[in-house]
């Protein structure tokens, strides 16, 4: 059975320019991400700094534009000054966030020099938990100042003559989270004042930089969105972005929950835009705040216990547990655990994050930075021995390759479904989503190259879509083709590595209309070029 669907696109209906940083990634030294994937001095491909050249070369072949580093919860207890200079003089610390030892073999300079080697722009998160304004000032001076001062000359002494030129700086990480070291959960006004003063001082060191202030690190927290409002009232005119994070969970194998996940991001984005615009008017400010969704993901999760009636206690209580049996882990870069994937259709994992990017494209006028938490691993998956491609790479690669220029509005006519509210455990409870479109889409028009691309997800997990793409108004273009990616029922779990896009059969373009059959749970890319 198939369901009829129609999408209309007109190049005159523009949303806003698409920032290349929309397709960025995130890095934090958790597990083997840094000490294993990035750094392993014993690896056969290791360079003189201990970086794995196989991973660097794999990432260079992708279009990943930017990465937020070095964290993450980790930075709220990390002193960057302990990580510079000769390695034998660096201080090893406990990482309270992830209960691991941080040897600082990969330090401030290594993070930035690794980014230079990969050709990926670094976006830096400072410590505003245990750190202070002077730490931030010295960091920008060390990183970006030409020379002639203590910190800039120290950078030269340690081997980097020229400034790194980092342009985007994050004013702490998830500073509202009760799990954060030195959290500002209880005092958003004080964090807003600190962010204001820190941003001001950092920009006095380097007037070319931009800063991002933390808002609520999840729309599921009980203090959201009032915490955000209190922060923004104190620092609106001193910062350039708000830093947003959200992880949406879905029960393993539940197609309806996975395919509707991006709707929760839509609610979050719309609320934050409204909040920023309210504060703009409150401040009588000409500044239109930009958004940075710099940690996001859609992940499978098994159902756990739910303790009804304990919400107010359990939210902070979950993060205030003190287990004397829990020790600290030391990660050996040369002893990485095998990479494992959940036993489920890989298209769910692939489309979950791709749908979030489509949501960001539909708000491209305001969202200028995106950092997929698993982005580096999606772009270039690796284990101890080699790098390889996983199915989630392909939608991400299509978006990075073709999602440039201007985002266009798409009009969607299709059948819909309702998602009931659901709970997976005490901290993962989600309201219902009514009237979820089976068809999810976004479009990008690159006027410089003369290319128009329409990205389409068929969310339907049972039926194909009898699909029509109406591009009336697109004169002087020719239809370049339709690629599709899906998992056939005959494909077993061991064959998932072979899931990849291919030209779709049976797609026909007549005049300004394209007709196609969209497979269930599929990724589709329609391309037009100037004739």
Locations of the language-model features?
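Non-catalytic accessory regions flanking glycosidase/transglycosidase catalytic cores in CAZymes
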Residues: 1-225, 233-241, 265-266, 270-294, ...
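Active-site His/acidic residue clusters
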Residues: 245-261, 306
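Histidine/acidic-residue-rich catalytic or RNA/ligand-binding cores of hydrolases
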Residues: 302-305, 310
């Amino acid at each position: 059975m198939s369901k009829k669907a129609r999408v209309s696109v007109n190049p005159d209906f523009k949303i806003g320019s698409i920032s290349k940083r929309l397709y960025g990634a995130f890095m934090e030294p958790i597990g083997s991400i840094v000490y294993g994937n990035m750094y392993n001095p014993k690896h056969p491909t290791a360079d003189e700094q201990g970086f794995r050249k196989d991973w660097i070369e794999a990432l260079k072949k992708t279009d990943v534009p930017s990465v937020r580093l070095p964290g993450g919860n980790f930075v709220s207890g990390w002193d960057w000054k302990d990580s510079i200079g000769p390695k034998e003089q660096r201080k090893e610390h406990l990482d309270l966030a992830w209960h691991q030892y941080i040897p600082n073999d990969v330090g401030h300079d290594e993070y930035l020099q690794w980014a230079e080697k990969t050709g990926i722009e670094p976006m830096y998160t400072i410590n505003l938990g245990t750190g202070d304004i002077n730490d931030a000032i010295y960091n920008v001076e060390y990183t970006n100042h030409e020379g002639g001062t203590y910190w800039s000359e120290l950078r030269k002494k340690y081997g980097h003559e020229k400034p790194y030129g980092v342009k985007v700086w994050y004013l702490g990480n998830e500073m509202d989270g009760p799990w954060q070291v030195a959290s500002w959960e209880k005092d958003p006004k004080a964090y807003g004042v600190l962010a204001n003063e820190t941003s001001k001082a950092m920009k006095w060191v380097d007037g070319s930089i931009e800063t991002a202030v933390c808002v609520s690190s999840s729309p599921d927290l009980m203090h959201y969105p009032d915490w955000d409002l209190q922060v923004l009232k104190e620092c609106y005119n001193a910062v350039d972005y708000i830093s947003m994070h959200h992880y949406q969970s879905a029960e393993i194998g539940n197609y309806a929950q996975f395919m509707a996940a991006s709707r929760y991001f839509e609610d979050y984005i719309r609320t934050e835009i409204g909040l920023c615009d309210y504060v703009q008017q409150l401040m009588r400010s000409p500044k239109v705040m930009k958004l940075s969704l710099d940690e996001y993901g859609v992940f499978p999760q098994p159902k756990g216990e739910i303790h009804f009636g304990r919400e107010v206690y359990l939210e902070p209580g979950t993060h205030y547990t003190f287990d004397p049996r829990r020790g600290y882990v030391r990660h050996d870069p040369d002893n990485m655990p095998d990479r494992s994937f959940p036993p489920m259709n890989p298209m769910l994992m692939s489309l979950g994050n791709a749908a979030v990017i489509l949501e960001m494209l539909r708000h491209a006028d305001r969202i200028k930075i995106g950092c997929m938490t698993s982005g580096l691993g999606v772009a270039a998956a690796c284990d101890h021995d080699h790098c390889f491609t996983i199915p989630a790479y392909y939608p991400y690669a299509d978006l990075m390759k073709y999602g440039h220029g201007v985002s266009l509005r798409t009009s969607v006519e299709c059948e819909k479904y309702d998602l009931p509210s659901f709970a997976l455990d005490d901290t993962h409870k989600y309201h219902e989503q009514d009237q979820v479109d089976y068809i999810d889409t976004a479009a990008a028009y690159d006027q410089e190259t003369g290319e128009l691309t329409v990205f389409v997800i068929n969310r339907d997990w049972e039926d194909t879509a009898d699909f029509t793409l109406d591009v009336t108004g697109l004169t002087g273009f020719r239809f370049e083709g339709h690629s599709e990616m899906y998992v056939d029922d005959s494909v077993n779990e061991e064959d998932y590595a072979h899931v990849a896009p291919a030209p779709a059969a049976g797609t026909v373009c007549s005049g300004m209309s394209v007709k196609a059959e969209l497979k269930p749970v599929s990724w589709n890319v329609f391309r037009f070029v100037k004739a």
